[in-house]
Design a protein with these regions (language model features):
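Signal-transducing coiled-coil linker helices
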Residues: 1-16
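Short N-terminal helix-loop-first-beta-strand/juxtamembrane motif that initiates sensory/input modules
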Residues: 23-29
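Regulatory sensory and allosteric helical modules in signal-transduction proteins
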Residues: 34, 51-91
Length: 147
C-alpha cells in the first residue's frame, strides 16, 4: 500500500477529530503527523474562535509524554493537577487554556503515523473508558485510511 497523504486522508482525519471530540466529551482535538522527530499539525477541531497549534511543529524529544505514547503505542492521559505531570506538556496545556489531555498514537499502514491529542477545558481527567472509545474511533479511521 502507498502511504495516504492526499486530501481524502485530510478529510478523513478532520471527520475523525470531530467524532473524537463528541465521542469522549472533549473540547478540542488535534491530529498531527510524525515525521522523524517532528510533529506537524494536520487538522484540529477547536471551540469556535479558538486556534490551537496554528501550524506549529513540535520536536518530539522535547515532550517526554508524547515520546512515550509514540514509542509504546499506548495512550496516556494527564491533567494539570497531576503530581507527575510532564512539565513540557503542562506548559502547552496552560498556553492553550486547557486542563486535561489525552494522547493516542495513530496507526496507518501498520505503523505509527501520527498523534491525536484530545483536550478538556475543565480538569475532568480522561479515563480508561475515554481511552477505549477514542481507540475504537481511531481503529475505524485507520482501517478506512488503509482501505
Amino acid at each position: 500500500m502507498t502511504e495516504p497523504t492526499n486530501l481524502r486522508l485530510i478529510d478523513l482525519l478532520a471527520a475523525t477529530a470531530h467524532e473524537l471530540v463528541a465521542g469522549v466529551n472533549a473540547d478540542a482535538c488535534t491530529v498531527s503527523r510524525v515525521i522523524g522527530d517532528v510533529l506537524i499539525l494536520i487538522t484540529e477541531r477547536a471551540p469556535e474562535g479558538m486556534t490551537l497549534l496554528g501550524g506549529q511543529g513540535y520536536l518530539v524529544p522535547d515532550y517526554p509524554l508524547t515520546q512515550a505514547v509514540l514509542s509504546s503505542g499506548r495512550p496516556r492521559a494527564m491533567t494539570l493537577s497531576d503530581e507527575d505531570a510532564d512539565p513540557a506538556e503542562a506548559d502547552v496545556l496552560v498556553e492553550l487554556g486547557f486542563a486535561s489531555l489525552l494522547m493516542l498514537p495513530l496507526a496507518i499502514g501498520g505503523r505509527t503515523w501520527g498523534l491525536v491529542e484530545l483536550y478538556r477545558l475543565e480538569p475532568h481527567p480522561f479515563d480508561a473508558k475515554d481511552m477505549s472509545v477514542a481507540g475504537e474511533i481511531l481503529a475505524r479511521a485507520s482501517a478506512r485510511a488503509d482501505g
